[in-house]
UniProtKB/Swiss-Prot annotation:
It comes from Maridesulfovibrio salexigens (strain ATCC 14822 / DSM 2638 / NCIMB 8403 / VKM B-1763). PROSITE patterns: FUMARATE_LYASES. The keyword Cytoplasm applies. This is Argininosuccinate lyase. It comes from the Bacteria.
């Protein structure tokens, strides 16, 4: 048997060292050791229940695998690159511990269904961690909204001042985005929660296996329907990574806003010292490095996703060695997404706001212009005409470096005789927000309802 490989019976020549270095995966797939051992223990128990192994043999295997787990977690386990992957490393060490019965563990199983099971279990564990982290993040944004219902700031389109909104409404927009991300994570969990054990290499096996038993021992909800599909697709990984990419997209958007808001020209937020860095030459600097890095890491997560999609796009059924390239992109995506969600929640909890600067910004950019147009519509003027009248008033005020609310009634009447004293109630920024009564708007009733709904959801 060449190289003493577990698969070496068919080979006479030794594997070239360069090939071993090029093809090994143990340097990174050892991250799946918990899942691999759990999957092997479930497989052994199932084999015993089906009469393929004796109960005594299964018990020996399970206890031997427990010892392997202890050795790995204590740092005593020696990973050997020449063994190719974690499966061979673990099985080889198991056989050293328990003797010839170790060779029976792989009965009715291929590394193809073995690694598919390992990876599904790993992705599921990661998604559960994302789900928990997102819940804390949603709670952080909801808490900020709850504490800032009365604070107003400009709402923007094209990054130009548009209409006044409450800071609570702004925070809630992100809470809803992350809640949708949470629901996508749950959907990913539901679809990934399928046990491939029993599919073997690609066509199933002649042994009387019972995949449902293996799934039960692993706590997985369902079993595969088609053995080719079970071992050859990584859609559950790509779907998780796409969801991670969307999470990072939403994080990157709030990061962009926080970077802008931290600029003294805006001054809307007080960057927590714990989440800022300084300059080696400019003593006054307080840089939003965490936000900038998170914005930058978003592209990295996109790259992880596209890397795996490109790997899988041309693969014929069933398993191909290309699929070894599925793990490192996901490991990187998982680490980046989870860390980003956690640190954003912590940063938002520590974030301070500058309501006075937000209020000052309301007076720049004619954010009450739409209110004047709506006021004129209420006086019976068609909206397009009201839009033109308001635009003319804005042009005059802008030329004189004034706000609409600074113009006298007589001046406003030169644009329309429909304008009366009550117009000044409409031009108030606070009134503009209070007058928003449509569902989902920035109006107080809508904001209160949103906060209540999110709080109720978080308690479930």
């Amino acid at each position: 048997m060449a190289d003493n490989k577990l698969w070496g019976g068919r080979f006479a020549a030794k594997t070239a060292q360069s090939v071993e270095d090029y093809t090994e995966s143990v340097s990174y797939d050892q991250n799946l050791y918990r899942e691999d051992i759990s999957g092997s223990q479930a497989h052994a128990k199932m084999l015993a229940e089906q009469g393929v192994l004796t109960a005594e043999e299964a018990e020996i295997l399970v206890k031997g695998l427990d010892q392997v787990l202890e050795e790995i977690e204590s740092g005593k386990f020696e990973w050997k690159k020449e063994m190719e992957d974690l499966h061979m490393n673990i099985e080889s060490r198991l056989t050293e511990i328990v003797g010839p019965v170790g060779g029976k563990l792989h009965t009715g199983r291929s590394r193809n269904d073995q690694v598919a099971t390992d990876f599904r279990l790993h992705v599921l564990r990661s998604l559960e961690a994302w789900k928990t982290a997102l819940e804390k993040l949603i709670a952080s944004f909801t808490a900020k909204a709850d504490a800032n219902r009365e604070v107003l700031l400009p709402g923007y389109t094209h990054l130009q001042p548009a209409q006044p909104v409450s800071l609570a409404h702004h925070m809630l927009a992100y809470a809803w985005m992350f809640k949708r991300d949470h629901s996508r994570v749950v959907d990913c969990i539901n679809r990934a929660n399928v046990c491939p054990l029993g599919a073997a290499a690609l066509a199933g096996t002649t042994y009387p296996l019972k995949p449902a038993t293996s799934a039960k021992y692993l706590g997985m909800e369902d079993t595969f329907r088609n053995s080719l599909d079970a071992v050859s697709d990584r859609d559950f990984v790509m779907e998780a990574m796409f969801t991670g990419s969307l999470i990072m997209t939403h994080l990157s958007r709030i990061c962009e806003e926080l970077i802008i808001w931290a600029n003294p020209c805006f001054g809307f937020i007080k960057l927590p010292d714990e989440f800022s860095t300084g300059s080696s030459i400019m003593p006054q600097k307080k840089n939003p490095d965490v936000c900038e890095l998170m914005r930058g890491k978003t592209g990295r997560v996109y790259g992880d996703l596209f890397s795996l999609m490109t790997t899988c796009k041309g693969l014929p059924l069933a398993y191909n060695r290309d699929m070894q390239e599925d793990k490192e992109p996901f490991f990187d995506c998982d680490k980046t997404v989870h860390a980003s969600v956690v640190i954003m929640a912590d940063m938002m909890d520590a974030m301070g706001f500058n309501p006075a600067n937000m209020e000052s910004a309301l007076k720049k950019g004619f954010l009450n212009a739409t209110e004047l147009a709506d006021y004129l519509v209420g006086k019976g003027i068609p909206f397009r005409e009201a839009h033109h009248i308001t635009g003319s008033a804005v042009a005059k005020a802008e030329a004189e470096s004034r706000g609409l609310e600074d113009m006298s009634l007589e001046e406003l009447k030169t644009f329309s005789d429909k304008i009366e004293e009550d117009v000044f109630e409409v031009l108030s920024y606070e009134a503009a927000v209070r007058r928003r009564v449509s569902p989902g708007s920035t109006g107080p009733e809508s904001v209160d309802s949103q906060i209540a709904e999110l709080k109720a959801w978080l308690k479930k």
